[in-house]
Amino acid sequence: RQAGQGHGLRPFGMFALNSLRIEKGYRAWKGDLSTDYTVLQAGLGRFIDWDHPFRGREALAAEQARGADRRFVTLIVAHETHDAPYMSTIWHAGKVVGETTSGAWGHRVGASVALGVVRADLAQEGTELEVEIFGARVPARVQADGPLYDRDNMRLRA
């Protein structure tokens, strides 16, 4: 505990790490990234090496040609006491349009933040949605693609 105190370092835990990664838009395997979503839906198309053959290439090329039907988004959720749980339903105009994959209070941005997947036509910045948290629908707004905090990655230096 004493090592690092002179540099302002303090102990922290998994909840802090989770909050920080969600504010940055970093996705976690098995929660945010899984076989439930294609690489294009996950916004990771830049990592596809189209110059080499791979299983599922034709299906992925067809999806790329028509456009992914779902997209990952970052949401600011208008709730101050509960985070959006894993797989909370996301609503628009009275219909389920997606699900959350992660949620936490964003201490740097001072708001509840959720990552989720929604219909592609609703993935635009400013789109008003609702996230169901323990049976109550709570207003949420789609944020600009990218980190909510430290967009230029200036804080993430070792």
Where are these regions (language model features)?
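Conserved, structured C-terminal
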Residues: 1-158
